[in-house]
Amino acid sequence: MSNQHIEELNDQQIVRREKMAALTEQGIDPFGKRFERTATSGQLNEKYADKSKEDLHDIEETATIAGRLMTKRGKGKVGFAHIQDREGQIQIYVRKDSVGEENYEIFKKADLGDFLGVEGQVMRTDMGELSIKATHITHLSKALRPLPEKFHGLTDIETIYRKRHLDLISNRDSFDRFVTRSKIISEIRRFMDSNGFLEVETPVLHNEAGGASARPFITHHNAQDIDMVLRIATELHLKRLIVGGMERVYEIGRIFRNEGMDATHNPEFTSIEAYQAYADYQDIMDLTEGIIQHVTKTVKGDGPINYQGTEIKINEPFKRVHMVDAVKEITGIDFWKEMTLEEAQALAQEKNVPLEKHFTTVGHIINAFFEEFVEDTLIQPTFVFGHPVEVSPLAKKNDTDPRFTDRFELFVMTKEYANAFTELNDPIDQLSRFEAQASAKELGDDEATGVDYDYVEALEYGMPPTGGLGIGIDRLCMLLTDTTTIRDVLLFPTMK
């Protein structure tokens, strides 16, 4: 520790270090050792919820708990405190004549934030609060910094995101939200495993960005002296496994996209991608609906959910609508009709739809109309299918109308939650679409990808008809925890 650091310590930090030294002089390790507890706060509160003060007095049940000291009050020979563990808090009642002078001094000198082990009898106070009447106290770890202001919790948004450890200590709602996130991911796994899918792991470092339209992070592999990219999707590797005969695979993992940040976007995020041989996009719609309804029922219970004051009927069958029909319903423009690029551009100008340089086909303009007019109207769970082929380089063309693909996106509360399609398994068609993407990249489309010749070669060995799916897990967590920013469901969001 440098002298400069010592000089920067405030009065509280200095006092805490003095107490640390005093513990050492007493032969007590300030940072403790293994401690065996017999119960958590949650277990005790659940087990004795219906027991009165008299009941507990007669039972004479003992318990050993451990956790962080969050409150402390009292004077003389009696004190009260609250110990916090991962399930919540429980009060401890400490009497000098019950724990002994040495033990009582440990309690008396303990600072808020310190970790203590407490053994004692389960009781209920005159006020009705479940408590532990301590018979022995063990010092477990010294906190050298004071906690955030104890009564109001941590409220500074920047600190909440930059110092999540303090947020978790101070804000129980935040702690519970991340427990829910963990349950959501566990339930997704449970659903996929029970439906015969195999969980796999694919590379994070790729030679060529692919599987999505996004700008990648670029890094350098020193040993091979080559530039590589962090994956923007897991798609192309997972489909290689379908070629290899695995038939049903999925991966839950981090994806990296070198793009802007807002309420629903973080440069690194978690997704699930899944691929099922011998299925099409309609089968995958059923799978997607099944995943989301299973997770919602497990985490939130039966019935609709409430998101920011809006009732979402997530327990009912999801609406299904073709993109062209959705655009027609809102704007009155019928893109089913054959039209030239010039006619489509004129319609866009008439409706003030921004036109990008790489919008070189009617399909690009249909997609722009959808994004401009339809997305913000999609509140209830809605599958929008039939995306133009130009914006779906990995999706199979529709048999009836090859201008469109057998692709869908799931929207809830105006946001996209899933993207899926009947996979393109024609290597010749795939190569031409990769080449079209490469051309768009040259015209300035930063999200367009290059040509992955190795993937095309894999397709040439034959891939069965396949349906594929990607779900943004962070957005699903936002929906099911009623939060409005992705930073509230990421333990460590990207910060400037």
From Swiss-Prot:
Database matches in InterPro entries: Aa-tRNA-synt_II, aa-tRNA-synth_II, aa-tRNA-synth_II/BPL/LPL, Lys-tRNA-ligase_II, Lys-tRNA-ligase_II_bac/euk, Lys-tRNA-ligase_II_N, Lys-tRNA-synth_II_C, NA-bd_OB-fold
Cofactor: Mg(2+)
EC number: 6.1.1.6
Alphabetical UniProt keywords: Aminoacyl-tRNA synthetase, ATP-binding, Cytoplasm, Ligase, Magnesium, Metal-binding, Nucleotide-binding, Protein biosynthesis
Record note on cofactor: Binds 3 Mg(2+) ions per subunit.
Binding site for Mg(2+) 1: E409, E416
PANTHER family per record: LYSINE--TRNA LIGASE, CHLOROPLASTIC_MITOCHONDRIAL, LYSYL-TRNA SYNTHETASE
Stated family: Belongs to the class-II aminoacyl-tRNA synthetase family.
Assembly and interaction partners: Homodimer.
Name this polypeptide is given: Lysine--tRNA ligase
Organism expressing this protein natively: Streptococcus agalactiae serotype Ia (strain ATCC 27591 / A909 / CDC SS700)
